[in-house]
Amino acid sequence: MGQLHFFFFPVMAHGHMIPTLDMAKLFASRGVKATIITTPLNEFVFSKAIQRNKHLGIEIEIRLIKFPAVENGLPEECERLDQIPSDEKLPNFFKAVAMMQEPLEQLIEECRPDCLISDMFLPWTTDTAAKFNIPRIVFHGTSFFALCVENSVRLNKPFKNVSSDSETFVVPDLPHEIKLTRTQVSPFERSGEETAMTRMIKTVRESDSKSYGVVFNSFYELETDYVEHYTKVLGRRAWAIGPLSMCNRDIEDKAERGKKSSIDKHECLKWLDSKKPSSVVYVCFGSVANFTASQLHELAMGIEASGQEFIWVVRTELDNEDWLPEGFEERTKEKGLIIRGWAPQVLILDHESVGAFVTHCGWNSTLEGVSGGVPMVTWPVFAEQFFNEKLVTEVLKTGAGVGSIQWKRSASEGVKREAIAKAIKRVMVSEEADGFRNRAKAYKEMARKAIEEGGSSYTGLTTLLEDISTYSSTGH
């Protein structure tokens, strides 16, 4: 059997493309021929890192498919989820993505890969793969835990048994007692109405169940009960091969994942080097979560009231800075560093001065926090983030929440400065802080071992490659 060839096709969003790039690098480092499929305006996300890894003998090819934005009523430059002008245009975006099917089939015809690893949001790729008799493996970009919770919520609809939005219900049939409120479940799930998005989600689930299996950016020791639940109780074929961000050993790779950082990495490291171990709070809400100006104002006041040193990453599209409390930067200039734009997150979380991570609980960020051994202050906003929060606070017990209870795609609001300061202090300086820290450090060590030769994720990838090799030689 010759060299295996994998196609990697992420949906065009930073939170999906970056782990896919890491995954392609990981597969290539194990002797696989890796090809990433993307669109012309997203090539930059991958190209620099691919160039940088050439000297290590890691060869990754990029193949481009034109994105039909204009034909689907989107602005010409709109080739990424974060560039969509409004949520109303989400269906247009996915319609445009579906039009990439024919060019993808031409590429498969030409290159004859052995396997297609594609994003959950590309459900039509299951049929494409079947057409060429190659396995399609789904990449969700989230945790085993979140998918187990989501599955139970969908099947059992426990949110129907409560009389108010604030009353908690237990999610049935899980290894732990997980409690949620109605407003922490996505409106698509709880409304029961059919919309373009609910139809899309249904298609994604059906396509999932027909696919060959699912690959996870996670590791067995982190979610043991839920890996078992997903594979044995729900009966799905799955491989845990993460944390993918840990394949970035090089300082350049850690610093420049996805976009160029808005701060010089040396300046950032110098600032962190001048601080005591575990003394800095890192605040960052990913590339998609939106906050109202009043919520950002409360966050600033909460950070200041916590009395802790901090690095705060603020998205640049907030042109006017009316939300910054008057004199905030002046008062906190010794204590804090504000980064406007994109930060070298993995580099920051790996630094010993960082003692807590205020996060929206997107899975990439959550796992990067775990890999850095950093306790978390959880502030979920939408998607499956409320489920990931429960994994951190109830199962791993490596963090505490600010009390965010409202699933909101547009803009998070309603969390008060007192709650923010209290959660930060609880994780940083309360009598519980050492416990959070020790558990977080233990998971960091487990993560490191998982990706080393003989570790659970290393072995998981070996198994995946063997499975595909067998499939290729037998045709099933």
Swiss-Prot record:
The keyword GTP-binding does not apply. SUPFAM superfamilies: UDP-Glycosyltransferase/glycogen phosphorylase. PROSITE patterns: UDPGT. It catalyses: scopoletin + UDP-alpha-D-glucose = scopolin + UDP + H(+). CDD domains: GT1_Gtf-like. Pfam families: UDPGT. Belongs to the UDP-glycosyltransferase family. This is Scopoletin glucosyltransferase. The gene is TOGT1.
